[in-house]
Amino acid sequence: MTTTSQPIKANSNLQQNDKTLTHKLLLINGVNLNLLGKREPEIYGHTTLADIEKNLIERAAKYGIELICIQSNHEGKLVDEIQYYGLLAETAAQVDAIIINPAAFTHTSVAIRDALLANQKPFIE
């Protein structure tokens, strides 16, 4: 059984200097990244994905950015999330850009690449 994290969003108590969150970014992490901190810590370290996401959400909020973090081991779930936060979302729910670490899907997923292109939002791997 694989775990899929629910989207994690910045909340108001993370905002610094009363800045409003003016941009929205989607951070996507792919296959096996949920094991960070547990899997081969001598190679990948002891920091968990949850720790990394929490740190990034706090840092993004300082710059007025709402960061939505998702992780899945399932290719179709990642495609669904890309579509949801892009073309299928109401304007207010759409993200401004996507940051993706597809992990093993980097070499094999035409579906994720197609979803990113169809989304018509800037993205970076």
Regions found by a protein language model. Name each.
Residues 57-58, 63-117:
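Helix-adjacent hinge/juxtasegments
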Residues 36-51:
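Glycine- and acidic-residue-enriched helix-capping/strand-helix junction motifs
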Residues 21-25:
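Extreme N-terminal starter segment of soluble prokaryotic enzymes
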Residues 33:
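ATP/NTP phosphate-donor binding region
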Residues 117-125:
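Short, acidic/small-residue loops that bind anionic groups at enzyme active sites
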Residues 43-45, 115-118:
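Glycine-rich, phosphate-binding/catalytic loops in enzymes
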Residues 1-15:
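Short coil-to-helix leader/linker segments, especially the first N-terminal amphipathic alpha-helix
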